[in-house]
């Protein structure tokens, strides 16, 4: 209260000591002066106090700034409070469109896939690929592994053989000390899989790690893994201090943390058909297949192309990961690391033609969860999970991988046939019209006009201006 009193006193004096015009816009000099002042205790302010401070400190029209923030608040106070408590210093909700891509056949089962994304044409491309492959046997998927990783990083300056002997006696103590943390996970069939001592001193002086593998079943497992790792670190330090073979401060734990690189948590997704089945209007099946293979080969050897190639895959993956309440940043980091595992960044997808059978596939690491986190808190995440039939983590891995493969197929198909802009810009047309503040009649006329014309921003501007003049 004392702080708030001082803060309010500062605001009052500030308004008294500065001249403002009668318009809602602050004079430039005043805004510049207030922008240079820091604030302490911001997190302790109420939500209303936070947004008032932001509006009056950073915006030339505070009333408008407040109005925009509040326009996106939910009318249901309990639902808004739920969103407010997801993160810190929440001031409003940031909307992304939630779309769906129907008609995905995965292992002979039909799915409608939820996709949360702001980029136009992604959902349409996924839907188109789903229909294309649905008529050709659908997508086939296999989970190749679900092992997740965490590490205790530490330094050791003593004799390596002493450390190796010490670790052999330490390992069972690490597991027993973490028993209270792993009991419930073990009842469900998960838990600690392996703990290995890794010598990294050739890469960095005195650097060692405990490299630990876990099975977390339907949980993404971040909290479980990190809790186990911190217990391992505590046990490691305690046992080293009590071992006469170690000198004081000879072993020092640096940090304990899970890894988002999970090369043993892999899912494979693929499609295949006879090359003749790839034929469509004005497209020869074999020619298309051979050109498609060449496009994949280019992305395999050329990092500049591979980055954009894989970004397109992640358009599909991220959209489903986000819609299902999973951590898309973790997935992105792990997938891109996997794409560079050979030492050069390369394509995540592969293609082949064998005995006239075209096969297109991808193997990627996906550490996902269907319990915990936002999966049971966010109403739209729960809705998305039910839309998918409340899948297990293994099933969700397969669905997400298929979304990425479908997206990549659609993109490479467009690139090697009509070009990417034709389809993308038609989907982007509505965004351009909204930027130009087109009314419903103008939108309808413009959409009709560009059904047979190439869509560019300048062409749309010219057409709208012609309508209005």
State where each predicted segment sits.
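Conserved phosphate/anionic-ligand binding catalytic regions in large, soluble enzymes, centered on
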Residues: 98-125, 217-225, 300-325, 404-411, ...
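Flexible, glycine/charged-enriched surface loops at secondary-structure junctions
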Residues: 138-144, 181-194, 239-260, 328-334, ...
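A structural-propensity feature for long, helix-poor, extended segments
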Residues: 139-168, 339-401
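Glycine-rich, mobile lid/loop segments that gate access to catalytic sites or pores
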Residues: 148-300
